[in-house]
């Protein structure tokens, strides 16, 4: 493919910035259009699975990521009383050739932003540009943006436009105007970080409880003020029926009083949920939402990527991971294909079906289903967890999700690289 193509990326989040770096590595020079006027290191933690870390490693970013994140070594599923349901090694310890990295989402975004400016130049990112219209005319994309500072329209043309602008994607809305709000499963998440000594050795992930009431925690680095571990934590509670309209006010400040009483006695060896929550900074409240899988991502020379294409519940650590893989696959196809049309066709064929399967599996709780199985068996039967939920059944749940999502070690370690050169 001609390396002089005009490529526009709507969205300067993790996926859009990874797409820019991937396209640059393949010999192209894209331009990123971001709606906010200034990016800031916002958010809490995110997990990057080994197949996403592989892609960032091949972009030359691994060593620096390990300096600001944590290489996770194991995952532990616990009952609400602290009994171990399932343990498995993660990352390099599990036999992958790349680690699993837990990192602050905002730090990751700012790191990628710096790399885009360093490699592509400061003018590769246009801030404060809100997309308001897009169409393809004679094999050229015509897009309109509103400058948030001046309120003036800006018109651009490109050979291809990537919509990587998140779950509320303006690009997606151009082609699915009647889709409406994201789908809420009735679960609310309260999230924050706390400066504490991370439990279970300092490089472990903890999933405890069941889908209707769950605690998740993992370290994402060091707290700059105290030098302690920066522990990302999430408390989930089912608050209404599946399919109810989601709250209008997203990512709003959370109140401990709304959830902490339900976790008041969640104290186990090395894990004290009330103490962890009490030590936190600001708490944020989110609805757990996704969208139905789409029948089509690509319209003429416009396509979708990341959460704009396949937003999913934050289960199984696959949200950012799948978006990063989208970006790398797209860049590889653009470099190898004979036309933009072939690129878009192959990209969607490679990515749409597998991400749709993950979205639907996450609605069934994905690997976290093992917690519901344990809670149901213990609640309905008499006996030990060992007898009520055989280890072979637990292993089958974990393996099934890895195989469906394409991240069992054999698959990741043996597949060909998406690097062009």
Regions found by a protein language model. Give the residues of each.
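C-terminal helical "tail/cap" subdomain of flavin- and related membrane-associated enzymes
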Residues: 2-5, 67, 82, 295, ...
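Conserved N-terminal glycine-rich FAD pyrophosphate-binding loop of Rossmann-like flavoproteins
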Residues: 37-55
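Short, solvent-exposed loop/turn segments at secondary-structure boundaries
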Residues: 43-45, 100, 246-251, 315-319, ...
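Acidic/histidine metal-binding catalytic segments
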Residues: 67-68, 124, 265-281, 340-345, ...
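Conserved N-terminal helical subregion
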Residues: 2-7, 51-176, 180-191, 243-245, ...
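Conserved FAD/dinucleotide-binding core of flavoprotein oxidoreductases
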Residues: 84-109, 113, 146-156, 195-285
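Catalytic P-loop NTPase motifs of RecA-like helicase/translocase cores
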Residues: 39-40, 170-171, 311-313
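Conserved mid-domain beta->alpha element of the FAD-binding
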Residues: 8-27, 31-36, 162-163, 190, ...
